[in-house]
Amino acid sequence: GGFQCSLHNGMDALGITADAIDVVGLVGFGQQVGAELPSYLANEVRTEVGQQARLVYCSSHHEGHAWAAIGQLSLKDALVVVIDHSGSIIESAKGGLDGARVEQTSYYLWRDNCLKLVSRDHDAPGEIGYGRFYSKVTRYVGFGSYHDAGKMMGLAPFGATERIGLIPLAFESKEGRETTA
């Protein structure tokens, strides 16, 4: 599949063809914030949608989530909070995700048709943000991958504190980092 499968399924569901597409939004992941759209990706997208579509690239994974949320808003002003397992690289001494500052919790302000990053949390190397912590809980209860966090979210309403009790799911380590028990 890749994006081609999603694109064609979406066009089929809407009953449109590629020539009806004016703008394509592309979002980076696991790349440095501020990176340029890779030319191979631009070429691949243009092959599917044609030359008429304008390509808009968002190198920040979290900014991409924020724009998707804003697209659903009817409000003039909003605080958009993105809580994710991990997004794009903010800063990396080694050039990869290992030991890098990575987007995990980002706050954006939407005002006057402008999206502005206000702050970030949990982005230092080794820190565990809310999304990553949730994925660790997902693994702790027996799911095989952090990709199963959505299944875990679906089970949340069925939880019963009297059955679960006070199981210590996490604690703070000597270095001040959260970790699973």
Model-derived segments and their meaning:
Residues 1-181:
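Short acidic/glycine-rich loops and adjacent helix/strand connectors
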